[in-house]
């Protein structure tokens, strides 16, 4: 018996059946492999504190330790015209507001001329010896181009701006999101106001949660 239209109710071709089964199996295996690839593919961190970086001694450090605090992330240099004023102001800010609720996080960068020529340890030692800084220093990084440090690229992608000189500053909230950024020559007083306001919010929130 044939169905309406003259088509047989069952396939009478064994080869066609085998081909259909084989095709179905191939598609199924392909879907499973695609799903496995997606599951195993490393996920891009969704916030700044989800990244790992190297400290000045080359040791891997998880930025997770700073979650719950405000962070001012800065690309620093030892031989820039702005070095002295920035290091002194940053240390004062770190001393006044940190480290319980706030930290300055310094990343030396050598992509702007000869303003940073030493090693990561040299940069840290210079800042400590010359300006008495106590905030954390990390390994020297690149912040521009294909070799940019992923953690710093997260900052620049967040604001759609790439630093054009040393001492750009990115304010990161307790959840790891960038809330403000400042260029090199912007007054520290405006930065201080923004950071202080964020730190106050953190303190008030913790008091409410107690």
UniProtKB/Swiss-Prot annotation:
It catalyses: 2 glutathione + H2O2 = glutathione disulfide + 2 H2O. GO terms for molecular function: glutathione peroxidase activity. InterPro entries: Glut_perox_Gpx7 (IPR013376), Glutathione_peroxidase (IPR000889), Thioredoxin-like_sf (IPR036249). It is found in: Membrane. The chain crosses the membrane at residues 21-40. GO terms for biological process: response to oxidative stress. Belongs to the glutathione peroxidase family. This is Probable glutathione peroxidase 8. Its EC number is 1.11.1.9. The keyword Oxidoreductase applies. PANTHER family: GLUTATHIONE PEROXIDASE, GLUTATHIONE PEROXIDASE 8-RELATED. Disulfide bonds: none annotated. Keywords: Membrane, Oxidoreductase, Peroxidase, Transmembrane, Transmembrane helix. It holds the Pfam family GSHPx. The gene is gpx8. One of its GO terms (cellular component) is membrane. It is a single-pass membrane protein.
């Amino acid at each position: 018996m044939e169905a309406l239209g003259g088509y047989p109710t069952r396939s009478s071709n064994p080869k066609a059946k085998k081909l259909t089964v084989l095709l179905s199996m191939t598609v199924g295996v392909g879907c499973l492999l695609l799903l496995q690839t997606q599951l195993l593919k490393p996920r891009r961190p969704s916030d700044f504190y989800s990244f790992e970086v190297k400290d000045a001694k080359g040791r891997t450090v998880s930025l997770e330790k700073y979650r719950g605090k405000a962070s001012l992330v800065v690309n620093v240099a030892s031989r820039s015209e702005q070095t002295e004023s920035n290091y002194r102001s940053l240390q004062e800010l770190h001393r006044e507001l940190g480290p319980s609720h706030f930290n300055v996080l310094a990343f030396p960068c050598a992509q702007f001329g000869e303003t940073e020529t030493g090693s990561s340890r040299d940069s840290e030692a210079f800042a400590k010896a010359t300006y008495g800084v106590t905030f954390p220093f990390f390994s020297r990084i690149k912040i521009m181009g294909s070799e940019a440090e992923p953690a710093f690229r997260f900052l620049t992608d967040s604001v759609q701006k790439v630093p054009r000189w040393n001492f750009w500053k990115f304010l990161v909230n307790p959840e790891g999101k960038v809330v403000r950024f400042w260029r090199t020559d912007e007054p520290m007083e405006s930065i201080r106001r923004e950071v202080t306001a964020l730190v106050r919010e953190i303190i008030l929130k913790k008091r409410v949660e107690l």
